[in-house]
Structure formats: C-alpha cells, structure tokens
C-alpha cells in the first residue's frame, strides 16, 4: 500500500498494524515528505515497523503521490489453488477526514493485467524491480506525460481529418507548458475541449484564433473537488483515465503517479 496523507487517527493504518500482528505480510510505501503530514507519517511508519511490517520510503528524489493498495490472496478453484491480486487505485488519499470532505474516484478490481501492472510498480518502489513497460497504467515520471500528449495529439489529428474529436479533463491545477501548448493546437484544429480546474490554471480560454474551442470552469460546492479524470473520444473508443496527478511539472516529472 502507498501512504501519502492518512492523518493521526486512521482505521486503515490500524488495520494494517493488526494484519501484521496476525502474521500477514504487510508492505507499506510511506511518503515522509507529504507537506503538513510529515509527523503523522513518521509516527505510522514507526508503529508499522514495530509490529514487523516492511516499511519503505519510495524512490530517492521523487515523491510517491500515487494511491495504490494491493491484496494478494491464495484462493481455491476447481483446478487447484491460485494467487489472486485485488487492487484499489484512487484519485484521493487514504485519509479518513478528507474522504468525507473531498470528492474522489477509486477503482477496485481483480483484473489480472491491472494487478500485474500494480505489482510491477510496487516492486519498483520497494527496490525489488526496475521500471517496466505497463499495459494499463500510465506511470509518472516515465510515461504519463508522453501518453497525455499523445492522446491530445490524436484528437488534433482526428479534428484535422474532419472526424469527431473531444477532450474533457478535470483536475486541481493546470500549469505544465507543453500540455497547454498541445491543448491550444487541438483547439485551433477544431477539437472541443472542456476543462474543469479547481485551482490554478494558466491556460487562457476563449481567445480567437488560439483557444476559442476551450472552456474552463471550476465547480464550487459542498465538497472539495479533488478527483482527476480525463476523457478522450479516441476515434470512438472513448478512453477515460483516472489519475492521482494534476497537469503540472511536479506531477509529471518529479512524482510517482
């Protein structure tokens, strides 16, 4: 499991401690540089180590901002026992307080290919493996930015060919220069783009000849809009990507996402 923010009173962290005490093999990737949560994370890391959990601190030089949880179980089937991976991937932190106040999405799956990708990422984070080409996950700092750029470019090509093209993206911040430039190019090609950005956005929408096909808005309501979700028409395949990353330099290039 990865831990970025979890607070001082976490049922989930207590459950991990209990699992380790009950003889389960528990590995936790704890980010000690999560701003304002450093003390809480150090405390949980110490308690986990005391009960025999394997605690690691990610990759030197990169913050581990991804939100991933994997449970591996041996299950009996007709042809014998098999190891099955259950995986949770989220846009938000495993934090009891923000889980009540923020809007986030999560995917819970036992799909073997997704489980294999997550397993490879955990091997990399714990020092047991190197970065691999993943089938379903777009991982920063290796492939996420390049894949986002490629997806925008595909919509641009479709629009120039007179085909349907559409981009909808929701995030907390939009700052990364190359991504913004590619969105401008897509707009000029005729791609209709809706951006829902909660915080800082340096893209300028509605400028004739540059961004007249781009609309930017924020949603203000009872809950803090925290999830990141990106939609690309993709020639009718309609790709939808959930992410822990905003479109910022730090997320694309200096964090594990």
Write out the residue ranges for each language-model feature:
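Short, compositionally biased "basic patch" segments
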Residues: 113-132, 147
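Gly-rich Lys/Arg/Thr-decorated short loops/hinges at beta-loop-alpha junctions or inter-strand turns
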Residues: 128-137, 162-164
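PLD/PLD-like phosphodiesterase catalytic module centered on the HKD motif
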Residues: 5, 11-12, 16, 22-99, ...
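Short acidic catalytic loops
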Residues: 1-2
């Amino acid at each position: 499991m990865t831990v970025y923010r979890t607070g001082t009173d976490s049922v989930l962290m207590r459950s991990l401690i209990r699992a380790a005490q009950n003889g389960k093999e528990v590995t936790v990737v704890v980010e000690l540089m999560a701003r304002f949560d450093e003390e809480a994370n150090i405390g949980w890391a110490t308690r986990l180590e005391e009960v025999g959990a394997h605690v690691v601190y990610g990759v030197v030089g990169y913050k581990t901002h991804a939100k991933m949880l994997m449970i591996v179980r041996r299950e009996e089937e007709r042809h014998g026992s098999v190891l099955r991976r259950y995986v949770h991937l989220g846009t938000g932190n495993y934090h009891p307080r923000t889980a009540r106040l923020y809007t986030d999405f999560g995917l819970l799956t036992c799909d073997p290919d997704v489980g294999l990708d997550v397993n490879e990422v955990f091997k990399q984070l714990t020092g047991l493996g190197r970065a691999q080409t993943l089938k379903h996950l777009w991982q920063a700092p290796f492939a996420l930015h390049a894949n986002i750029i490629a997806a925008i470019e595909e919509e641009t090509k479709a629009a120039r060919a007179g085909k349907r093209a559409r981009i909808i993206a929701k995030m907390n911040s939009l700052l990364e220069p190359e991504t913004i430039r590619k969105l401008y190019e897509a707009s000029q090609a005729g791609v209709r783009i809706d951006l829902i950005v909660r915080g800082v956005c340096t893209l300028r929408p509605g400028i004739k000849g540059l961004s007249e096909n781009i609309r930017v808005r924020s949603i203000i309501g009872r809950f803090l809009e925290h999830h990141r979700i990106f939609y690309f028409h993709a020639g009718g395949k309609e790709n939808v990507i959930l992410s822990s990353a905003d479109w910022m330099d730090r997320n694309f290039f200096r964090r594990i996402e």
